Curated annotation (Swiss-Prot):
The keyword Cytoplasm applies. SUPFAM superfamilies: Ribonuclease H-like. GO terms for cellular component: cytoplasm; ribonuclease H2 complex. One of its GO terms (molecular function) is manganese ion binding. GO terms for biological process: DNA replication, removal of RNA primer; mismatch repair. The gene is rnhB. HAMAP family: RNase_HII_B. This is Ribonuclease HII. Residues 72-256 form the RNase H type-2 domain. It is found in: Cytoplasm.
Amino acid sequence: MNKETISQIKARLQTITDTTDPYLQTIHDDSRKGVQTAIQQFERRLARQKEAEEAFNNRFKYEKYYWENGCQYIAGMDEVGRGPLAGPVVTCAVILNADFDLIGVTDSKQLTRHERENLYLRIVDEAVEVSIAVNDAPVIDQMNIYAATQDAMIRAVNHLHHRPDHLIVDAVPLAIDIPQTTLIKGDQKSISVAAASIVAKEYRDHLMRDYDYVYPGYGFAQNMGYGTKEHLAGLEKMGATPIHRRSFNPVPKYLN
């Protein structure tokens, strides 16, 4: 009879990552309800882990294809901030290694702030290279948001020390002399694009939280410049700030 306590068995199961581990057989016939519950929880955890690994590998298929076809440096690209009434559009290019294995990397919109912050630090640390480019509100007003996004993306690529052999871009085709694959919802289909989306969002969110101190009353730390009720109330009360986009409605109504 297994003399381990249920707590000891649970702790041991937390260290096991393989269903063929011999220890599982030693506790399989333990009739204690707590042990059987712990085994079921372990099996569910491993099933979720396997599902996450398969999803990760599926999101790495574009990078693997281009590596296998002679490309060395593949840059995933994404942007954050095309829709807000205030603040910049931020773009990012990320080049990853083939051994990159942060399974949690996915579309930044599906992650909590805590998850994004942790992944941001890991991506910046583990990526071959990360490049960020920004266009502020005056440039957006001058060029239009789509052109300003393309411009920032191209600058992000040109700032890379390693010239990419191929680009994987989320939705926005670029006028640049590098072969590229454009994916709709690319941050859900490519690990490199997802990594770029996380870095771009964390970078922009940090900027907007700083702007919240400079321009209080609009809720920038919470709404990141999007047109929430609090933001619109701030515009009504105080007018537009220098970081508001004059070409985005309803901002022109609140220009002094």
